[in-house]
């Protein structure tokens, strides 16, 4: 294979991952801050099979954000559902913490975005993690890996670097 082609493919993958990370994080912050400012419940729909985010707001028109098509996305909110509808409280918070993993075309995880809803802070917290080059985590074993690293954070920090 041509080295220039391989480097271009790696560059495009990194660009797509950064775009996806930014769009997902900004969409969640937008809905969270809007619900906090307006003191109203807001909704965000995450459709990972169609690779888009839909923001529904009673006072604003529905907004659709398209995610990069070449990547694969997985969330830990519920089991085996590619579509997920989240409601944000009047305080801009979510009821259940969860994560979104971003995979490359080879189905190897490259990025993790964690969303936390806390009663004390009453505001959504988002952490971004970049995969270190240690072990390979694939789409087929991500559910088990996520459960194990939630129980053992030392393993988690061997594989991930917080940004």
Give the predicted meaning of each segment.
Residues 26:
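Short, conserved clusters of charged catalytic residues that mark active-site
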Residues 14-17:
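Interdomain signal-transducing alpha-helical coiled-coil linkers
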Residues 3, 9, 19-22, 33, ...:
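N-terminal helix-rich module
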């Amino acid at each position: 294979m041509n080295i220039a082609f391989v480097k271009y493919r790696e560059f495009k993958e990194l660009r797509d991952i950064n775009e996806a990370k930014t769009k997902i994080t900004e969409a969640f912050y937008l809905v969270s801050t809007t619900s906090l400012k307006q003191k109203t419940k807001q909704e965000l729909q995450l459709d990972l099979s169609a690779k888009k985010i839909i923001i529904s707001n009673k006072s604003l028109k529905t907004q659709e954000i398209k995610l990069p098509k070449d990547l694969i996305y997985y969330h830990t909110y519920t089991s085996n559902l590619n579509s997920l509808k989240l409601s944000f409280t009047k305080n801009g918070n979510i009821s259940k913490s969860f994560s979104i993993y971003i995979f490359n075309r080879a189905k190897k995880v490259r990025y993790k975005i964690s969303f936390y809803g806390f009663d004390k802070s009453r505001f959504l917290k988002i952490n971004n993690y970049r995969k270190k080059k240690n072990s390979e985590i694939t789409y087929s074993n991500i559910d088990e890996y996520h459960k194990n690293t939630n129980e053992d954070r030392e393993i988690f920090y061997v594989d991930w670097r917080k940004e």
